[in-house]
Regions:
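Hydrophobic N-terminal alpha-helices or hydrophobic patches in metabolic proteins across all domains
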Residues: 21-308
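N-terminal amphipathic/basic-hydrophobic helices that include classical n-h-c signal peptides
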Residues: 1-19
Length: 308
């Protein structure tokens, strides 16, 4: 904590010196000094927030599902930049960049100072907002297209929220996926049952035609759902003239699309399992996973880029 406060004070001093230099409008010496002060301000912010970046990195490494959504976010950002000829330039401060950096400092250190009073959820929200604002600040300094930077920053903020939801919603998502899958399978098979095996690590099992199937963590659909949400967020935020409510509805609807397609994946796997046998089960398990993931991405792209 003391390190954070020291970095905070040091960065505040740097920013005040920078603003004074700008207002004094002195020759090139002050301009060069201001230039390296900009970099120091960003370095201080990055150093202060490095534990959060490390935690996010560890979460991505530990979770294949979270890794999928992160890859989708990065690839979507690159594709948008390439398709709209958005190119980075040498970093430099602007009023918008400075505002975003100040917001990052205020949110991040506000979370550290008021964490005990706010509670864990508001503290995490403030912390992640601060980290996202820092990324927006760096983006505004490196890109001229503000809409692109804000779209990526907003999608990244949603990704940070998903990073803490990956374990919280594991069991509820498995239950929901199992219920919808059982409902669809019951249309074709009279002997469908869904069971919950309680214990230190609760499990969801499905019995179809006398055969039992485990709805494991990999089947909870978090990977496809989070990827749909992140992809929809960056596309709708960048895409234009829709209202905030419509954009929010599209993002939520994209998550619902991911949930439905994940349930259909489970149905497809169970339907093919008796024919595939034990040796072919894993192949079809993975094949249907990739197929429905690709379908979900295509549907979300179509939905998010559709003209209002």
């Amino acid at each position: 904590m003391r390190i954070f406060f020291c970095l905070h004070r040091f960065a505040a001093l740097i920013l005040s010196i920078y603003i004074m230099d700008e207002n004094e409008n002195k020759p090139d010496t002050n301009a060069r000094r201001a230039a390296w002060l900009e970099y120091v301000a960003w370095i201080c912010a990055a150093a202060a927030m490095s534990p959060v970046f490390y935690w996010l990195g560890a979460a991505v490494v530990d979770s294949q599902q979270l890794r999928d959504s992160f890859i989708i976010l990065v690839v979507a950002g690159i594709v948008i930049a390439m398709s709209h000829e958005i190119r980075p330039h040498r970093p430099h401060f602007s009023a918008d960049s400075l505002t975003a950096l100040c917001a990052a400092y205020a949110a991040f250190f506000g979370a550290q100072i008021l964490g005990d009073r706010l509670g864990i959820i508001p503290t995490l929200l403030l912390t992640f907002f601060g980290v996202s604002a820092f990324i927006v600040s760096a983006g505004l300094a490196c890109f001229d297209r503000k809409r692109y930077v804000y779209a990526f920053g907003g999608a990244f903020f949603i990704f940070t929220l998903l990073s803490i939801a990956v374990r919280i919603f594991d069991l509820p998502l498995r239950m929901l996926a199992g219920k919808l899958s059982a409902l669809v399978l019951s249309l074709f098979n009279d002997t469908v049952g869904l069971y919950m095996m309680k214990g230190s690590d609760p499990q969801i099992a499905m019995n179809v035609g006398g055969a039992s199937y485990l709805v494991a963590t990999e089947c909870n659909g978090f990977g496809i759902i989070s990827s749909c949400i992140v992809l929809s967020a960056i596309l709708t935020f960048f895409g234009g003239s829709r209202s905030i409510l419509k954009k929010g509805a599209i993002v939520i609807g994209s998550g619902l699309i991911g949930y439905i397609l994940n349930s259909l994946r489970i149905v497809s796997i169970i339907a093919v399992a008796p024919l595939a046998g034990e040796k072919g089960y894993f192949y079809w398990h993975e094949a249907f996973g990739y197929f429905y993931f690709a379908v979900a991405m295509l549907v979300v792209i179509r939905l998010s880029r559709r003209n209002p």
